[in-house]
Curated annotation (Swiss-Prot):
Part of the 30S ribosomal subunit. Interacts with proteins S7 and S18. Binds to IF-3. Keywords: Ribonucleoprotein, Ribosomal protein, RNA-binding, rRNA-binding. GO terms for cellular component: ribonucleoprotein complex; ribosome. Coiled coil: none annotated. InterPro entries: Ribosomal_uS11, Ribosomal_uS11_bac-type, Ribosomal_uS11_CS, Ribosomal_uS11_sf. Located on the platform of the 30S subunit, it bridges several disparate RNA helices of the 16S rRNA. Forms part of the Shine-Dalgarno cleft in the 70S ribosome. Belongs to the universal ribosomal protein uS11 family. This is Small ribosomal subunit protein uS11.
Amino acid sequence: MARDKTRTKRKERKNIASGVAHVNSSFNNTKILISDVQGNAISWSSAGTMGFKGSRKSTPYAAQMAAEDAGRKAQDHGVKTLEVEVQGPGSGRESALRALAAIGFNITNIRDVTPIAHNGCRPPKRRRV
């Protein structure tokens, strides 16, 4: 019983003029998702997928590399203008935004969508080094 060879369908090239860049920057990693205006994903990348491991994932340079990777994939689909939604307290927020602008995207607006707890869960205790 030989298995039939299945072909994986290549992602077809979409022609989308504008999109939304969701930059999620935590203390440990930075993830960038570029979607169309409806929220359907076009491209994504993170510091971990760029080959950074451990504490190097949380650096601004790793966030910059991830943003450039996601941005280039989105440009292949025809994205030219971006709205940027930044979320989280991490160090990669600013550098990811600068990297997207440096690639050649026209950034129309920047929103901070970090959720703020109204006395929710107790935060982790401070580190004593």
